[in-house]
Structure formats: structure tokens, C-alpha cells
Amino acid sequence: MQTYLVGGAVRDRLLGLPQGDRDHLVVGATVEQMLALGFTQVGRDFPVFLHPKTQQEYALARTERKQGRGYTGFVCHASPEVTLEQDLLRRDLTVNAIAEDEAGQLHDPYGGIEDLKQRLLRHVSPAFAEDPLRILRVARFAARFHAQGFVVAPETLALMREMTEAGELAHLTPERVWKELEKVLLGPTPQVFFEVLRECGALAALFPELDALFGVPAPAKWHPEIDTGIHTMMVLAQACRLSPELAVRFAALCHDFGKGLTPPEFWPSHHGHGQKGLPLIRDFCERFRAPNECRDLALLVSDLHTHIHIAFELKPATLLKVFDKADAWRRPERFAQLLDACRADFHGRTGFEERVYAEPDYVARALAAAQAVPVKEIVAAGFKGEAIREQLAKRRLDAISRVRDEWTFLED
């Protein structure tokens, strides 16, 4: 019976990165032996155990045989006869197929250490093609390790393209796709994930609303990068710089879906694109069962981001309608997220990364002034019923107007 540290912990240590979960592989043991040593079995589909003291995971060495389509159609075989090399062969990437024994000796039968040095994400064997989820995992790894200079090996990218063309991605469940999407959006450079998917054709297969944006031009005056798909990736990168929140980053991803619907004869203008994108966002969120908070913020950003961009041109009454529509009175935190997404949209353009964008600050100040209007004073003044609501709106409008006047004075 031999125990090895495997997977991400070994990879990250060799890269000099913080180690996450420590997964162990046990070769030459039976279920009965593990239980006798005090381990607790937790694996349903294959033998995985928790260490009695550390609670770290220990899995028996196993092989996998494809039976059926998709990423769930596998039959696992675990026995004391399965070797270390056989177990590592079933793994996705060579950099994840390195093992370290209890003496600290590395075992690298498939060249993972060299690929770490070359910064390559390369599949271990042709069996990679049996699991379509690996397309998303490789794209996510490319995003996760982008800062370290990793790229997908050409032969792996070619295999991912073959899998996509064979329709394998159709076998992924919506929940599993969203889980991968959520992981990558919470990472540092999610735009790389979508770029890799586009290279292998998977973006069109999984996220056609996003793929449709590439090649769609926008006015060069406001979008020197021209391409709406490129702009969306730049906005996503800015959103990651501005906010750690999943909903903000997701909203940044979806904010220009409507531009993909503009007929070419109207390019590069996209009048009303925010509203045109709303059905696409709803369908996207329903398809992948996205959390309500992600859906709701994405809809708000698509609908209102152009209003925020021209906030200085809006009448106070129009700005009050924006606050009402966004339910900013009851959901001020979500409105702050909307402003962050708008900041990402503004700065996500070539040459605009460091430009001053004061509109969200003005809008936030106007909202704060309107929120400060005391309802108790209105009631104390004798207003009743519908008159309370009307008087509250009037006083909020006056508060916004004062902010507008003061802001104009400060700017001058």
C-alpha cells in the first residue's frame, strides 16, 4: 500500500503558488483496508475516503472506461492491482498528472514537469476526448494560470475543436456549465476562458449570444477597439479590477448582448441595444439556471447603462425614474453594483482605461440626497395616502435638482 499526493497540490507547489486542497491517491489497498485504518468512505461512484485526523481526501487508484456519451458515462474500476501510471493516465492534463510519494519523490510518467516549465496545458492521452467537460476545464485553467504565462497546447486545442464539432458539448448539463462559468468569473482573468472557447468553436456552441458579438462594429469615436466582442472582454477585465462580486462580472459579460441583434445595414450604430438584449439575457439565465441576483443585475445593467453614461444630460425627473425603475430605494447595494458595471463598461475601451468618468459619482450623490428625504416629516405635515407618495417624489426631485446645481457649480 503506497500513498501519493496528486493533482493541483503538486502542480501549485512546483509553480510556487499557494496550495489548495490536498488530494491523495492510494495504490495497492482495498476498501476494507482503508476502513480498518479508520478512514471514512464518502465516494458514491468510486472509493474516496476521509482521513480520520486531517479529513483530507484519499482515493483508491482506479481506471475509467467510457460507456455512453457526455461527461457522466464512465465506468470506474478500483482495485489493488491498478498502478500509479494507470491512474494518472485517466487525468485531463499532464500538469495535473504528477504524483509525489511520502518520501517527497516526484513521479511524472507523462511529462507534466516539462510542460510546467514550458507553460503548456496539454492533454495526457486521447481519452481526453471522452469527457466534454474537459473543454471547459482547460479553458478555465488557461484563465486561471494566464498570469503565469500558460497557454493551451496546439494539439490539445485541436482535439477540443474536434470534440466541439462532434457535438459533445450538447451532453453537458446546464448546472455543470454554470458551475464552470461561475468558477471562471470569480477568477482573475475570465476573458481568457472565453477567448479559448472561441478558438475551439465552443463559444458559439455554448454561448451563442456572446459569440455573436465578435465582428460586430461599434462607432470608432466611442469604441476605438471597434469590435463589440473585444469590447465585452475588455469590460469583463475591468469588472474584475473593480469588483470581486459574481453578479457584477456576469452583468459586465451580458451588458451588450443586444448589439448582436443589430442588422448589419445599421452598423456601427446600435440604438436601443440595451432593451433589445433583455430577452437574450433572460433566455441565457434560464438556460443555465443562473442565480436570480445575477439575472436581475444583468437585466438592470443592460437596460440602464446608457442612462448612467449620459447622467449629466438627464433631467432630474428622468434620473428619479431611473432610481424608481432600479428599485434603488429598497436595493441600494444592487444599485451600487449597477454603477460598478457601468464603470467597467466605460473603462473597457481602448484608450479609456484611465479616463475620468464622473457620472456614477454624480448619480450616487443624487441618490444619497434623495434617500435622505425624511418620510416622517411628510406624514407630520399632514399628508395622507397617495399624497404622501406624491410629496415624497416631489421632495426627492428637489433634492436631486440641488445636487445637479451644486455639481455643475463644482465642475465649473
UniProtKB/Swiss-Prot annotation:
GO molecular-function terms, A-Z: ATP binding; CCA tRNA nucleotidyltransferase activity; cyclic-nucleotide phosphodiesterase activity; magnesium ion binding; phosphatase activity; tRNA binding
The family database entries (PROSITE patterns) matched by this protein are listed as: HD (PS51831)
HD domain spans which residues? 228-329
Q: From the UniProt record, list the reaction(s) this protein catalyses.
A: a tRNA precursor + 2 CTP + ATP = a tRNA with a 3' CCA end + 3 diphosphate; a tRNA with a 3' CCA end + 2 CTP + ATP = a tRNA with a 3' CCACCA end + 3 diphosphate
GO aspect biological process, one term: RNA repair
The free-text cofactor remark is: Magnesium is required for nucleotidyltransferase activity. Nickel for phosphatase activity.
What this protein needs as a cofactor is: Mg(2+); Ni(2+)
Misc remark: A single active site specifically recognizes both ATP and CTP and is responsible for their addition.
Q: How does it assemble?
A: Monomer. Can also form homodimers and oligomers.
Task: Report the protein name in the record.
Answer: Multifunctional CCA protein
Tell me the organism.
Aeromonas hydrophila subsp. hydrophila (strain ATCC 7966 / DSM 30187 / BCRC 13018 / CCUG 14551 / JCM 1027 / KCTC 2358 / NCIMB 9240 / NCTC 8049)
Name of the encoding gene: cca
